[in-house]
UniProtKB/Swiss-Prot annotation:
Its EC number is 3.4.19.12. Residues 773-792 have a biased composition (Basic residues). It comes from Saccharomyces cerevisiae (strain ATCC 204508 / S288c) (Baker's yeast). Residues 2-27 are annotated as: DHR2-binding module. InterPro entries: Papain-like_cys_pep_sf, Peptidase_C19, Peptidase_C19_UCH, USP_CS, USP_dom. Residues 144-171, 211-220 have a biased composition (Basic and acidic residues). Gene3D superfamilies: Cysteine proteinases. Its main location: nucleus. This is Ubiquitin carboxyl-terminal hydrolase 10. Pfam families: UCH. Residues 288-297, 530-539, 749-766 have a biased composition (Polar residues). Keywords: Chromosome, Hydrolase, Nucleus, Protease, Telomere, Thiol protease, Ubl conjugation pathway. Residues 167-208 are annotated as: UTP22-binding module. GO terms for cellular component: chromosome, telomeric region; cytosol; nuclear replication fork; nucleolus; nucleus.
Amino acid sequence: MTTQESIKPLVDRILSNPLQFNAAMISNKSNNNDTSAAPENSSYIVIGKQHNNNSNSTAIAATAESKQIKENNLIDRPNGKKTNTVPKSMAEALLLYTSKNDKDAADATGAKKSAELSTELSTEPPSSSSEDDKVGKEEEEEGEIFHEARDYVEPRKASLKERDNADKGDGEDIGEDIGEDIGEDIGEDIGEDIGENLGSPLATIDDSSNENEKEKRKELSTSISSDDEIEDDEDEDDMDYDSSAMEKELPEEEENDSSSKISEGEKKSLYQDLMENSTVEVNRYEPVNNTKENGNRNPKGEEEEEEEEELKHKSRSITPPVTISNLSNFYQFNENINDRGSLNSTRIVKNWGDKFTNLKPRGLLNHGVTCYTNAAVQAMLHIPSIQHYLFDILMGKYDSTISKNSVSYTLAETSKKMWLPVSKNPRKNVSASYINPKHLISRLDDINCMMSEWQQEDSHEYFMSLMSRLQEDSVPKGHKLIESIIYDIFGGLLKQIVTCKSCGSISKTEQPFYDLSLHLKGKKKLDPNSDLSSDSINGTSATTSTTTSNAATKPSLSSSSSVNLNNGSPFAAASDLSSANRRFSIEKSIKDFFNPELIKVDKEQKGYVCEKCHKTTNAVKHSSILRAPETLLVHLKKFRFNGTSSSKMKQAVSYPMFLDLTEYCESKELPVKYQLLSVVVHEGRSLSSGHYIAHCKQPDGSWATYDDEYINIISERDVLKEPNAYYLLYTRLTPKSVPLPLAKSAMATGNVTSKSKQEQAVNEPNNRPLKINSKKNNRKKWKKNKKRKFTK
């Protein structure tokens, strides 16, 4: 018996280590802490200290006897002081921490189940030792007892229901839950239930230490919780942040990011401006949430989405779209060599022919800042009728009107070098990539004396000046400019009807035009008494609408060179286009121009002056097309002038591949539909800086980008997505109902001879046609000398 009595304390110490750990805290805790402290806090810290200090088996036995006495006292006195309640194990401490309303019942239940729980916990000595180490560290860092208890006994949501049932009497499975989850899931439960189940017992702690304890709990919960819980919490925090950040960012996005808002609205309809605001506000939240949830999105994906949006917008047309069935009623690009247009002109050829189809033009050398001339020349020489006309000049068809010193002849020689096929002889072969247009650049003073080859100029102004010079060279002296072949290619006729609101008189005018100028933004305002800086329309005339007026330099085109599609005002545009980032549709501006417009009298008594009643009054103006040009030049006014300086409007532009103007024509007998031929692009911030390039359609139907000396293949889709277009060239599609001019045999033979001469001019590398011209000149001189001899 003596041996058993001596071994029994050792066995009890090993088997009931958690019990001795808790019992030792009583004496230490009763000496150090106040009676007002929470029982679970005092008992828990005492357990840790007593376990570290006790080494005698007799002390362990004494503590066991004292615990039994205190348990009986607690059962007999349910309303006794809470400082006397001593948990027997970690599970009993759990019950004390998680129960608020029925703490006495929890104490009684814990006393009854202490033996079972202690045996279950004692079978895991590593966990108890790790608990002791953690408790010791926590005591050094923080003097509060409840902090260490939270570190280990935080419940999870799944076990809370079991613990509530344990308070009512179903506490049998608590020990199993603790043994399974004490080292795995307690940390997960801390982050979830810190504000749900532990808030009520925390209210009994001193107010001075509540804030510090809450901060420590958050730190411990984040350090103990598993990776999955951390990710879930971060996702929840991100979602909360998204909702708050989105509310703060939305007002700024509504002011600054108008491009996305407008692009969404225009997808619905360009005319439904009132519906835009409602639809955009709903759709704006989707990209914000997607960017927040997905984190950093792929920039390539964003670019592709933007490109798709731009393409969808650009493919839309306010005017009736040209469908495949409609296109079958027209001669397609380069389909019939005998296609001479819808105006029955016998002087123009609208298709390239078989010989040009196999040729590739060359680039043009940049002399420093001559990209504006190169882009304009490339756009003009990719018009089939212009190129055929220039080759006819080289073959001497227009020797009676065009001299060799003219700008037209210089341009013809430049075009010949551009289209010259590559020779098999390397000595005679020129550069296969580009040519030097030095002779054409040297004639810049004759084209426009206000321009300089050492300074960046306006490419559209150069194009119009070159067109004007070609028209002047092609008309004999004493003849009208509308008799020129240039008028057959670019010329149109506009009819304007102005009705006086005072007397009801109607004024009708007809004016030729060579391009259509579109403003991109501003208010509609008509000033008929303005000078040449604005586009005046007083019922009898219209000035030019190029970027800088051609009235001073080219009087031949100053009276009727172009039509301002913003109704005569430099500030006119669609009222909806107030944002600089809003995409501009040329179809909408054309429609706005041809709609009836009210000309109002302003405060300065400026308005329409009636020729009949001689009053300055209100009037209604209506415009229509009498003659649609074979080649339509659309100019976009992207530059504004403030005295001596200019600025560029950052306005994205959309334009269709096919443009329908039938509804704006006076006669509806023939449909008026156009196909895109060339796009000249300006890249830069101002008129005096930047760079010009040209997207042109090749004779074989493909598209190419001409960047001075460099030529790159480009797709038709990329051409339509170009946001920096400055001016565009459209060619009119000839309906198949129009008879082709093949009736007379003389015309047919003339066409064959002219075609053979053009092929000869292209194929022969050097000036063989010039030798023929020199022989003719020698014959003329010989005839003159012969006449002089006979007269003598």
